Amino acid sequence: MRPEDLQDLSLLGQKSVPYIFEYTPDVLEAFPNRHPENDYFVKFNAPEFTSLCPITNQPDFATIYISYIPDEKLVESKSLKLYLFSFRNHGDFHENCINVIGKDLVKLMEPRYLEVWGKFTPRGGISIDPYYNYGKPGTKYEKMAEHRLFNHDLYPETVDNR
């Protein structure tokens, strides 16, 4: 990695990093993709995502799956972790959390393709699994996003195989 690729990363390597538990997209950081000529997926699994129900103020728990095909930038993983932590005391519905995460990542990276899938644990006997995706307009990734959305989760799992 070239030193100039790291100059905008302020969180990685810091021993005392403040953990912010209110929604804070400003904590997200990106670095240059050194292989923009390649199409490849980057995937993150965040099994300890927590937010609050905006009505009851009760905690909601989820595993968040983020997959993207980068263009010129990649998200720095520690900043992503801190960003996801920032939802801890944020009151919002599951569907909105996933859409906000997706839109914030698109704004940060301008990826070729991105998807965010939240698999929330059941509350009141129902689990909610919102899915967001994005394909760069005017490219093959826009069609890819449409195809993946239309074919997403055709075979939903049962409660015992979550």
Swiss-Prot record:
Reaction catalyzed: 7-aminomethyl-7-carbaguanine + 2 NADP(+) = 7-cyano-7-deazaguanine + 2 NADPH + 3 H(+)
Residues that coordinate or bind substrate: 75-77, 94-95
Pathway named in the protein's UniProt entry: tRNA modification; tRNA-queuosine biosynthesis
The UniProt record lists the keyword Cytoplasm: yes
Gene3D superfamilies: 3.30.1130.10
InterPro entries reported for this sequence: GTP-CH-I_C/QueF, NADPH_dep_7-cyano-7-deazaG_red, QueF, QueF_type1
Ranges that cross the membrane: none
Primary localisation category: cytoplasm
Entry's Gene Ontology molecular function annotations: preQ1 synthase activity
SUPFAM superfamilies per record: Tetrahydrobiopterin biosynthesis enzymes-like
Example of a GO biological process term: queuosine biosynthetic process
Pfam families associated with the record: QueF
Enzyme class: oxidoreductase
Keywords, ordered alphabetically: Cytoplasm, NADP, Oxidoreductase, Queuosine biosynthesis
Residue positions of the active site: 53 (thioimide intermediate), 60 (proton donor)
Enzyme Commission identifier(s): 1.7.1.13
Gene Ontology annotations for the cellular component aspect, listed alphabetically: cytoplasm
Subcellular location: Cytoplasm
Role played: Catalyzes the NADPH-dependent reduction of 7-cyano-7-deazaguanine (preQ0) to 7-aminomethyl-7-deazaguanine (preQ1).
Protein family membership: Belongs to the GTP cyclohydrolase I family. QueF type 1 subfamily.
Name of the protein this chain belongs to: NADPH-dependent 7-cyano-7-deazaguanine reductase
